[in-house]
């Protein structure tokens, strides 16, 4: 009888733990979703303030001062909902899971590679953002896989803390491997000697045209917007 009672209690405890576990795992994504939407609202609030500026230029310097000293720009991609600050810190992993206000957030933030200069004067400036479950950050870059959308949307903009607007012409898209020389090598600088080699890398992994390849020269400043194939996919 005692053994039966003990087994009965053990079973009840296991059932309770199972219920708690089920609740936790169903609650956790919901909590993340709410937190992510709250962060989206904060960015929208900042956006409302910045669009009041002359020429619709986000006041990056003011956002940096009032919100987060890690803000190094603002990215706007017409035709998508990408319209928010770019952050940068010495640790590339930090903004993978932290918000504009430095709170933990699974969808992270859009951020500039730690190796890049914050004035975007590198030959290759990698900007990262998650492909998320709430259709924000860099999720809508996937729209560029539609040829019609791609044809109609050929530019995007980065605004700097010097009140500059950098206009980028979109020249290609593609799938790059996790080990990609343009990124894994420290501060790649184009020279007359290596230009052909790096043009070859771009042509191999993207749909860039030969004409656009030939437009790339040693003084080119390229921004490479990078995300993963799927949410939680680290190999895209």
Please give the residue ranges for each predicted region.
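N-terminal Lys/Arg-rich, disordered targeting/topogenic segments
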Residues: 1-7
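Hydrophobic H-region at the start of alpha-helical membrane spans
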Residues: 8-21
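Solvent-exposed, non-transmembrane regions of membrane-associated and secreted proteins
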Residues: 18-236
């Amino acid at each position: 009888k005692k053994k039966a009672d003990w087994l009965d209690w053990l079973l009840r405890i296991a059932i309770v733990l199972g219920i708690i576990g089920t609740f936790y795992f169903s609650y956790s994504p919901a909590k993340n979703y709410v937190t992510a939407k709250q962060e989206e609202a904060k960015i929208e609030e900042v956006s409302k303030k910045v669009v009041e500026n002359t020429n619709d230029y986000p006041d990056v310097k003011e956002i940096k001062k009032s919100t987060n000293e890690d803000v190094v720009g603002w990215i706007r991609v017409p035709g998508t909902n990408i319209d928010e600050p770019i952050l940068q810190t010495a640790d590339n992993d930090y903004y993978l899971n932290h918000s504009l206000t430095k709170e933990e957030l699974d969808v992270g933030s859009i951020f500039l590679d730690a190796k890049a200069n914050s004035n975007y004067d590198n030959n290759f400036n990698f900007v990262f953002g998650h492909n998320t479950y709430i259709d924000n950050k860099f999720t809508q870059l996937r729209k560029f896989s539609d040829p019609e959308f791609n044809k109609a949307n050929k530019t995007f903009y980065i605004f700097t803390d010097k009140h500059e607007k950098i206009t980028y012409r979109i020249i290609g898209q593609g799938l790059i491997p996790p080990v990609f020389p343009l990124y894994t090598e420290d501060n790649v600088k184009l020279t007359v000697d290596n230009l052909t080699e790096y043009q070859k890398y771009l042509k191999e992994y993207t749909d860039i045209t030969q004409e656009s390849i030939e437009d790339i020269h040693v003084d080119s400043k390229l921004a490479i917007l990078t995300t993963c194939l799927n949410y939680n996919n680290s190999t895209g």
